[in-house]
């Protein structure tokens, strides 16, 4: 990643970037600092490292190298920004590298995780599979194994909407994936296989809930053995062996690796979102699940966040999570109306969902058998 003779900067200053800085520093790599296009809400110093706006960076070494620790669809744009400032050595962070580095770092920190063999019984390394998936050449496809998974009751619901930009790469061609139009009650049909405004639904809450309207719909209306949620441009790259573990009960859920937050999850969240929303969420937990209120605060005072609202789980676990989650969000909606001005796309419940996802999973690590798998971005 760096030959040791150049300054290494991490481009980005949010969770992906901070996690990679933690992982690299833990194994002895020197990191010169973070670089962002515009500072926005980013702090001036992040975990002891300076955060520079690219226009303010004073590094006369044109050979300095940059790790682009942001979603892949931003890599080309950032390469152009760097080139405009005279920097031409940039490496985009790919899913395989992120998964390898963060797995090692989290394992070293004692983060609990149930692991399958490195090759999942396939003879192909996890890194190779993640890299191939990112290149749109792996993940379950319409072959015999994927057909068997579908026949066994595995369904991954892909939240998509009319606002989604076109992608160069398609989702994996697999019968386990089903596109679902999110917020279908509020927008024209887009040709998705399914809609979230059928049956029992909160489709009209989509401006505040984003993909969680699809999660709710899958909870209330689908009866699969294994349910999962993916997004139009990202998904969890699970292997057949990991789906098999869900089906035979040796695992309960597949999750992305958690992000590392600084100085803690609550502070990082509030840096980019309304602190009032976090306060309303804690009040809702105290009202709906009072026995978990103290635990929730303790978890958000820690460093880990499960992001993206993506999971794949046995139906009993998926449904239990939803039965826990949605009453909290309903309480926030009912008791904090100022967070939801009319005719706005606030995404408040969608963002709070990520905090609640983290609280639910981390607080149940001693009861649930959790597997962590790579997330893949489509571009």
What does each model-found stretch correspond to?
Residues 39-128:
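Phosphate-bearing ligand-interacting subdomains
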Residues 8-9, 66-67, 234, 309-310:
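A residue-level structural signature of the nucleotidyltransferase/glycosyltransferase Rossmann-like core
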């Amino acid at each position: 990643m760096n030959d040791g003779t150049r300054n290494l900067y991490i481009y980005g200053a949010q969770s992906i970037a901070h996690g990679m800085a933690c992982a690299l520093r833990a194994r002895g790599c020197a990191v010169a600092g973070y670089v962002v296009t515009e500072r926005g809400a980013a702090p001036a110093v992040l975990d002891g490292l300076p955060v520079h706006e690219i226009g303010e960076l004073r590094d006369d070494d044109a050979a300095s190298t940059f790790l682009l620790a942001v979603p892949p669809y931003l890599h080309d744009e950032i390469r152009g920004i760097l080139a405009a400032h005279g920097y031409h050595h940039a490496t985009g962070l790919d899913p395989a590298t992120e998964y390898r580095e963060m797995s090692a770092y989290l394992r070293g920190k004692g983060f609990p995780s149930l692991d399958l063999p490195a090759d999942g019984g396939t003879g192909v390394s996890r890194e190779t599979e993640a890299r191939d998936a990112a290149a749109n050449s792996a993940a379950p496809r319409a072959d015999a194994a994927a057909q068997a998974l579908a026949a066994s009751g595995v369904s991954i619901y892909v939240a998509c909407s009319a606002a989604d930009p076109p992608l160069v790469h398609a989702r994996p061609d697999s019968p386990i994936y089903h596109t679902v139009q999110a917020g279908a009650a509020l927008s024209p049909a887009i040709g998705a296989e399914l809609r979230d405004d059928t049956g029992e639904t909160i489709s009209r809450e989509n401006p505040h809930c984003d993909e969680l309207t699809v999660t709710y719909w899958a909870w209330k209306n689908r009866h699969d053995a294994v349910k999962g949620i993916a997004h139009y441009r990202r998904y969890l790259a699970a292997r057949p062996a990991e789906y098999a573990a869900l089906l035979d009960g040796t695992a309960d859920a597949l999750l992305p690796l958690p992000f590392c937050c600084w100085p803690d999850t609550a502070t990082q969240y509030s840096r980019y979102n309304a602190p009032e929303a976090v306060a309303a969420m804690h009040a809702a937990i105290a009202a709906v699940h009072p026995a978990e209120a103290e635990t929730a605060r303790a978890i958000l005072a820690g460093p880990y966040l499960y992001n993206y609202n993506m999971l794949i789980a046995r139906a009993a676990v998926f449904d239990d999570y939803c039965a826990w989650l949605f009453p909290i969000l309903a309480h926030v909606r009912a008791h904090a109306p100022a967070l939801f001005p009319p005719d706005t796309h606030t995404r408040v419940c969608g963002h709070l969902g990520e905090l609640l996802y983290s609280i639910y999973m981390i607080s149940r690590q001693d009861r649930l058998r959790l597997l962590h798998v790579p997330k893949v971005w489509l571009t």
